[in-house]
Structures are given as structure tokens and as C-alpha cells.
């Protein structure tokens, strides 16, 4: 009886569905990979023995390879989105530019991510790929940074749209409240506007959260692009935070 109640508990059911998704498994592996990256820095600074540091690095490398096949062909949805967004004449121009940059960057990022996988497996070598072999990692980081830049543009634009909408709604409410003729006071309209403001506030919080995540990921991409120099402690911590946010997003989207 207790066993049955546990197995069919809504949280357990949701957890099983969560773990059944390749996206959630990839995010969990990402969390472990960046945790290892942070621990490598921490153990080195704390003068741990070299065997411990090398073990953590080995685990980090193994997890990195394990993540690659879970992202295989992930560029295809972004290529599809490029065509859909480009054809959408009704989309806000700034959002359209941001989404095009985002999907262009991610499409090529995941393409080079696949090449990184082939490189790690030894199927792609300097002999059969020439100078590209030595540029793959940097190019992948470059296109990831481009994708993140597009995401940041859309986040900022969505924030402005929501703030402007709230401002207009508040002005309308104040206009109704300040009307000297109480008979014309539209309580229903005010209530509707308040509901819209609450919905906009929810969007604002989500956009701020996404913006924070994209900025942290940009630090990792900037390091990979060799545009800034940050230690593994900072990068590992940034990766841990963004991985947790990604896991939380997938968990919230999973239906029990």
C-alpha cells in the first residue's frame, strides 16, 4: 500500500516524466559538469593533492562528452525558426531582429557542437579537417555568444514592452479615478487593467530572470571566444546558476 502510494505520488510521477526528457538529462549533466569545473578551481586553490584534481577534471571531461549526443541535431529547430520568424510580418521589428540573431547563432553553435563531439571521439582530426580542427572550439563559443546576444536583445525589448504597457494601463486607471463624474467610473475596466498589470509583472519577472541567465552564460561564451579572461571558479559558479535555472524551467514545464 505504502509502496503503491509512493510510486503513484504526483511528485514521483512528475520526476519520472522530467527524467524521461533528454533536455532535462542534459541540463542535469550540465550542472554536474560546471560543478566539477568549480571544484577543480577550488581544490587547486586549497592545495588538494594532484590525484584529486585530476579525477575531478576527468569526471568533468567525461560528462562533457556525454552531453554532446543529447544535443545532436538540436540545430534543426533553430533553422526552422529562422524561416518562420523571417516570414512573420506582424512581429515587432526589434523582437524579430533579436530572434533572428538568436536562432542564427544557436543553429551554428549546435552545428559546431556536433563537430566538437566528433573531435572528442577522434572521428574528426587535423588530417581530415585541416585548420578547422583547431578553430572548432572558438567558433562554437563565438556562435553561442551571438545566440545569447540575440536572446538578450529580445529580453530587453520584452521588458520595455511590458513596462510601457503597465505605464499606459496605470495612466488609464488614474484617468478613471480622477474623473469628477463618478457615474462614468468604469470599475470593470479598472479591474481588467489591474489584471493586465499583474500579468505584465509576471512577464517582467520571467524576462529579468532569463536576462540574468543569458548574461551569466555570456561570461562563459566570452571566455570561450577568448575575449575575456576569467578563472574556472567564476565560470563554474556561473554555469551552476544557469544550469539550476534551466532545470527549474524544465521542471515547471513538466506536467505531473
Swiss-Prot record:
**Where is it mostly found?**
membrane
> Where does it localize?
Peroxisome membrane
Task: List, alphabetically, the InterPro entries matched.
Answer: PEX11
Give the highest taxon in the source lineage.
Answer: Eukaryota
GO BP terms: peroxisome fission; peroxisome organization; signal transduction
- The SS bond pairs are none
**Gene Ontology terms: cellular component:** peroxisomal membrane
Keyword field: Membrane, Peroxisome, Peroxisome biogenesis
Please give, as recorded in its UniProt entry, the membrane topology of this protein. Answer: Peripheral membrane protein
**Pfam families on file:** PEX11 (PF05648)
The record, for PANTHER family, names:
PEROXIN 11, PEROXISOMAL BIOGENESIS FACTOR 11
Stated role: Involved in peroxisomal proliferation. Could participate in peroxisomal elongation or fission. May be involved in parceling of peroxisomes into regular quanta.
The entry sums up its family as follows:
Belongs to the peroxin-11 family.
The protein, known as: Peroxisomal membrane protein PMP30B
Q: Source taxonomy lineage?
A: Eukaryota, Fungi, Dikarya, Ascomycota, Saccharomycotina
